[in-house]
Curated annotation (Swiss-Prot):
Residues 42-52, 251-261, 334-344, 396-408, 485-496, 692-705, 843-856, 894-909 have a biased composition (Polar residues). One of its GO terms (cellular component) is nuclear body. Keywords: Activator, Disease variant, DNA-binding, Dwarfism, Intellectual disability, Nucleus, Phosphoprotein, Transcription, Transcription regulation. This is AF4/FMR2 family member 3. The modification Phosphoserine is found at residues 755, 881. It is found in: Nucleus. Pfam families: AF-4, AF4_int, AFF4_CHD.
């Protein structure tokens, strides 16, 4: 070998080792100069008219160009003579000297070609455009396989460059490529086919599949000269692969072998492109390559390749599978790999023609070399994996494999091939995945199996799938955070997972085996799972679905679970798994599998029950085991009644996580209802897992805890489930529910008194609190009509029917499903509430009667009943004393969250009322626990400011519209200002989205009430970031805006419009009054300061400058001095105009400070005027609607200017609730 060859080899070695940079750079410069000279010399040999390399090789110049290239590269003897005569032949690596035997040269050339080809493949991946045109010359050069080494200097300049580069590559390939003989052969076969299909694609393919070439450093490709020499990039990869294997295997044969294995993995990414390339290139010179190959073996291999290539074009045309072609390739490739290892020399000839692609592969060579070690390992693994993958792929659907294949293929390609190849593989992951599958299948089939196109596709899918699963297993722990990023859905799922995990931990019943089996099933039936589970997952995943059809979601989840009954866990896991796939969150999927699977195991028993209740007859045969855990869970839930403290703690932890998330949802989502429901779902979900695995599973499937609650309460858990759920809903559950309502019910109470969320939430807490005695009474009195309410002491059922009547109108607006549940739940729980409330009222009747005024519509009875309804309120709300009411309302007003809120002590009345008669019958078996819980609740029940739970108001039964009027149950539970802020935003967003003006105004008014509560919480709490005064002032503006939406003074104004206006005026009056009280101290200070200032200034002004001139010093040019202090305002100007001897105090100009003080003082004192003005306006409107406001005053107690903000909020919310019912707004 010439000194230059040695230097070049050293250069490559040095480059791979990155040792001698200066030497390498010097060699590069020398090589560039030599190439430039050669190209200039070559110009003479070729017709100047042919600017072979003047234009990009991609431009198809027709047969002339290809013929020219073939002629240039094909005449090996001429090239040999030329190189031998050339003085610079020493610079060409692998160019045999006249005395050097040609066979070694051929070997070297083959190695170089294979190496360069491998290099070209990565580079072609990176620059497919270049590799495609280069591929044609490669074929030509293949024809002159010896020409590669000797044709390192192609007759044409561009060709010479390409050949020189190829020779350099070959030199590198000699060292490195010798290690890759097997890979070269495989690559050659693949390259031949691939080059025919499409050079760039082929290159990409080979970069992934024929990583044997990876051994070559990318230094040449990286050189600008290489970039300039597109012909080199255009070199056919087949030649390089065929040649490279002979010598390269010596150095890195094992790595090459691994590369081949990995190449099968990697190839899939690029094969689709090669298929197209094959169609294009096959016409060029693939057959010629075979003809020009120096060795018979090479020719035979090339011919086989060509034949395969000829087959492939139609297949490549059918690129959709793309795998079929690869399967064909893989067989020859595999054979070629085997042969290449055995027959390095013969294939050298073949490889030589293909060597032209080496230019493209040079860049990736170094990376490939670096990756060879990993590739070898991967190859070994892949061999085993292929077989496993085939089995899996046979069962797996091709689509699933494609999805997974893309990841594994990109993974394999990146590891086995250069970054370019990895990128290309990622670009065509689906196709590459199919290709890799086909290759793996073909390679295996080559052993003794015909290629199964369908099976190979399935195999790659399975292989990819298998690899993906393995990869997911590794990656999942890191990915779970992605869920949060993914969307509310992700956060919800995380929350759901955490609670589920907690439940699983509590239950300790989730079999790990079931989860793995589920995973396997998911892998095998991912398509089915993806189809159905995605739907199911979407239901939980998509908030809209969750809210809209929680029962349906539950049914779906149950059904999804049912299809694979063989594995009880599998159904649940499968559903989440598809969701994960659909979501694209692999870790999430895995987490879902475990957590959801566990949750499913623990909770599924109730899910089937819920499904049954939902009417979805879902049979979950494998779940008996799960049912046991469920039963245990129920037992544990019952135990939780006893150990409610621990459960509550857990729930509180879950709630703490949920609370911020619910807030986030509220903030992020414009539709307050959706956000609130989502937050509710999340909070409830987390709480549920702790309280009930059943509810967790249901919540996961349905996505709406409300609906889950309803489903569980109504029959979601079935007669069995209700009992278990009721037991589960002990004080701990109640506390949890209180928190959930804390986030959920408030908005709905305001928005929809009858909203399923409230009803279901109330139902839950009520269920836990029901007294069996009350329950026994309730069913009996359900049919009774509201008229029976003559005496509050009369049975609860009497008041309950009115509640049904009142509930139904509001429910009409609700969806049928909601209506059904509401009707069942609300009617039952309201009846229970009424019965309990009336029972309490009967006990309190003596005291309540003294407070209650006999108003029209049997207000005495109503009051006595209504007061008991809030039976745990510290004081009966007496309409007479607003202050006492205010104190009560402070206790109750902040949140109207349903009493069912998680307080273990949440209103017993609401709990009992929410209990259904059927619940009673169902719960009676467990009556002991329920009664205990109910008694505990009744004992501890402070009135919680749960969002208005609608308790049928007895006057409703007596009055005309009163039948629609229900008493809201308010929760005294303290809330943070942030909570009210979120609720207010949710309501405001809901109002923003509405079109109907009256409903819009109602929602704005309710949002204003939440803002008022927020301001009140700011007053009472430590939160000082935003002053209550500012909150109130902004609320005033919101109310004014709401009132402008619906005028009350026009001739078309309805009574509801006037009633709404009156309520808004009351709020404005009290807000202004409150604003004055907040700033009263400031007003007093301002008043004193102003009085003092004007006194002093008037005295001083008497001498030189009386205040007569509008308070300005007569001579002061700047009466409104920008400076705050009077002394500065005095200034030289003022003093000049006035007697300079005058003291600053004598100057009468009003400082800006004083002006600002006066303005602030006026604004504060104006609040009093506004307050009285609005109060008078409200009184005038109230006189026009005496009946409405008399009832409201009797029920809630009259509002006065001295009423507390809590009382005002509750009073207004009750009135708005009645207005909403009268307007049939949901």
């Amino acid at each position: 070998m010439d000194s230059f060859d040695l230097a070049l080899l050293q250069e490559w070695d040095l480059e791979s080792l990155c040792v001698y940079e200066p030497d390498r750079n010097a060699l590069r410069r020398k090589e560039r100069e030599r190439r430039n000279q050669e190209t200039q010399q070559d110009d003479g040999t070729f017709n100047s008219s042919y600017s072979l390399f003047s234009e990009p090789y991609k431009t198809n110049k027709g047969d002339e160009l290809s013929n020219r290239i073939q002629n240039t590269l094909g005449n090996y003897d001429e090239m040999k003579d030329f190189l031998t005569d050339r003085s610079n032949q020493s610079h060409l690596v692998g160019v045999p000297k006249p005395g050097v035997p040609q066979t070694p040269v051929n070997k070297i050339d083959e190695h170089f070609v294979a190496d360069s080809r491998a290099q070209n493949q990565p580079s072609s991946i990176c620059s497919t455009t270049t590799s495609t045109p280069a591929a044609v010359p490669v074929q030509q050069s293949k024809r002159g396989t010896m020409g590669w080494q000797k044709a390192g200097h192609p007759p044409s300049d561009g060709q010479q460059r390409a050949t020189q580069q190829g020779s350099l590559r070959t030199l590198l390939g000699d060292g490195v490529g010798r290690q890759q003989p097997r890979a070269k052969q495989v690559c050659n076969v693949e390259v031949g086919l691939q080059t025919q299909e499409r050079p760039p694609a082929m290159a990409a393919k080979h970069s992934s599949s024929g990583h044997c070439v990876q051994n070559f450093p990318p230094s040449l490709a990286s050189k600008p000269s290489l970039v300039q020499q597109k012909p080199t990039a255009y070199v056919r990869p087949m030649d390089g692969q065929d040649q490279a294997p002979d010598e390269s295997p010596k150095l890195k044969s094992s790595s090459e072998t691994s590369v081949h294995c990995t190449s099968y993995r990697g190839v899939p990414a690029s094969k689709p492109e090669p298929a197209r390339a094959k169609a294009k290139l096959s016409k060029f010179s693939i057959p010629k390559q075979g003809e020009e190959s120096r060795s018979g073996e090479t020719n035979s291999c090339v011919e086989e390749i060509i034949r395969e290539m000829t087959w492939l074009p139609p297949l490549s045309a059918i690129q959709a599978p793309g795998k079929v072609e690869p399967t064909k390739f893989p067989f020859p490739n595999k054979d070629s790999q085997l042969v290449s290892s055995g027959h390095n020399n013969p294939k050298k000839g073949d490889a030589e023609p293909e060597s032209p692609d080496n230019g493209t592969s040079n860049t990736s060579m170094l990376e490939d070399d670096l990756k060879l070690s990993s590739d070898e390992e991967e190859n070994e693994q892949q061999a085993a994996q292929r077989t496993a993958l085939r089995a899996l792929s046979d069962s797996a659907v091709v689509q699933q494999p494609n999805c997974r294949t893309s990841v594994p293929s990109s993974k394999g390609s990146s590891s086995s091939s250069s970054s370019g190849s990895s990128s290309s593989s990622s670009d065509s992951e689906s196709s590459s995945g199919s290709d890799s599958e086909t290759e793996s299948s073909s390679s295996e089939s080559e052993g003794s199996k015909p290629p199964h196109f369908s099976s190979p596709e399935a195999e790659p899918a399975s292989s990819n799938k298998w690899q993906l699963d393995k990869w997911l297993n590794k990656v999942n722990p890191h990915k779970p955070p992605i869920l949060i990023q993914n969307e509310s859905h992700g956060s919800e799922s995380n929350q759901y997972y955490n609670p589920v995990k907690e439940d699983v931990q509590d239950c300790g019943k989730v079999p790990d085996v079931c989860q793995p089996s589920l995973r396997e099933k998911e892998i095998k039936s991912t398509c089915k799972e993806e189809q159905r589970p995605r739907t199911a997952n979407k239901a939980p995943g998509s908030k809209g679905v969750k809210q809209k059809s929680p029962p349906a979601a539950v049914a779906v989840a149950v059904s999804a679970a049912a299809p694979p009954p063989a594995v009880p866990c599998a159904p649940a896991e499968n559903a989440p798994a598809p969701a994960r796939r659909s979501a694209g969150k692999k870790p999430t999927r895995r987490t879902e599998r475990t957590s959801a699977g566990d949750g499913a195991n623990c909770h599924r028993p109730e899910e089937p029950a819920a499904a049954d209740a939902l009417g979805t007859s879902v049979v979950v045969p494998p779940e008996p085991t799960k049912t046991r855990p469920c039963g245990n869970n129920r037992a544990s839930h019952r135990k939780e009644l006893r150990s409610s403290v621990t459960c509550e703690k857990r729930r509180t932890r879950g709630l703490s996580r949920i609370v911020p998330k619910s807030k986030e949802f509220i903030e992020t989502e414009s539709s307050s209802s959706s956000s609130s429901s989502d937050s509710d779902l999340e909070s409830e979900q987390e709480e549920y897992p702790l309280s009930k695995a059943q509810t967790v599973a249901a919540s996961a499937s349905s996505g709406n805890d409300q609906r889950l609650k309803e489903a569980a309460a109504n029959g979601g858990s079935g007669p069995r489930a209700p009992v278990g759920s009721i037991n589960a809903r002990t004080t701990s559950d109640i506390a949890k529910e209180l928190e959930e309502q804390f986030y959920t019910l408030v908005p709905f109470g305001r928005n929809e008194l009858l909203s399923p969320l409230k009803d279901s939430d109330e139902i839950r807490s009520l269920w836990v609190k029901i007294d069996l005695t009350l329950l026994s009474r309730i069913p009996e009195h359900l049919p009774q009509e509201p008229g029976v309410l003559s005496a509050p002491a009369t049975k609860d059922s009497e008041s309950a029917p009115p509640s049904h009547t009142s509930d139904t109108p509001a429910e009409k607006a609700l969806p049928k499903s909601k209506r059904k549940r509401k009707c069942d739940n609300e009617d039952d729980y309201r009846e229970i509430k009424k019965s309990q409330g009336e029972k309490d009222s009967s006990s309190r009747l003596a005291t309540s009667t003294s407070n209650t005024l006999s108003a029209n519509h049997c207000n005495m009875n109503i009051n006595s009943v209504a007061i008991p309804i809030n039976k745990n309120e510290k004081m009966l709300r007496s309409p007479i004393s607003p202050l006492s009411d205010a104190s009560k309302h402070k206790y109750t007003s902040e949140d109207l969250t349903s009493s069912s809120r998680p307080n273990g002590n949440s209103l017993f009345t609401s709990a009992s009322s929410s209990k259904k008669p059927k619940a009673d019958s169902q719960l009676q078996p467990h009556g002991g626990d329920l009664t205990k819980a109910a008694h505990n609740n009744s004992e501890n029940i402070p009135l919680h400011k749960s969002r208005p739970q609608t308790k049928p108001w007895s006057p409703g039964s007596n009055g005309h519209r009163d039948c629609k009027r229900q008493k809201l149950v308010f929760d005294d539970m303290p809330r943070s200002a942030d909570y009210f802020m979120q609720e207010a935003k949710r309501m405001k967003h809901k109002a923003d989205a509405m079109v109907e003006k009256f409903g819009k105004a109602l929602n704005y008014a309710e949002a204003a009430l939440s803002f008022i509560e927020c301001g009140n919480a700011m007053e009472q709490g430590p939160m000082e970031s935003k002053s209550p005064y500012t909150m109130y002032s902004e609320t005033v503006e919101l109310i004014r805006y709401a009132m402008r939406l619906k005028t009350h003074s026009g001739p078309n104004a309805t009574p509801e419009d006037k009633q709404l206006a009156a309520l808004c005026y009351r709020c404005l009056a009290l807000l202004y009054w409150r604003m004055f009280r907040l700033k009263r101290d400031h007003a007093v200070k301002y008043s004193k300061a102003l009085i003092d200032y004007f006194k002093n200034s008037s005295k001083a002004a008497q001498a030189p400058s009386p205040w007569g001139a509008s308070g300005k010093s007569t001579g002061t040019p700047s009466p409104m001095s920008p400076n705050p202090s009077p002394a500065s305002s005095v200034g030289s100007q003022g003093s000049l105009s006035n007697a300079s001897a005058l003291s600053p105090s004598t100057i009468v100009s009003i400082p800006q400070r004083i002006h600002q003080m006066a303005a602030n003082h006026v604004s504060i004192t104006n609040s009093i005027l506004h307050s009285y003005d609005y109060w008078e306006m409200a009184d005038n409107l109230a006189k026009e609607n005496r009946e409405f406001f008399n009832d409201l005053d009797l029920l809630m107690g009259p509002v006065t200017l001295h009423s507390s903000m809590e009382h005002l909020v509750q009073y207004s919310q009750q009135g708005l609730h009645w207005l909403r019912n009268s307007a049939h707004l949901s």
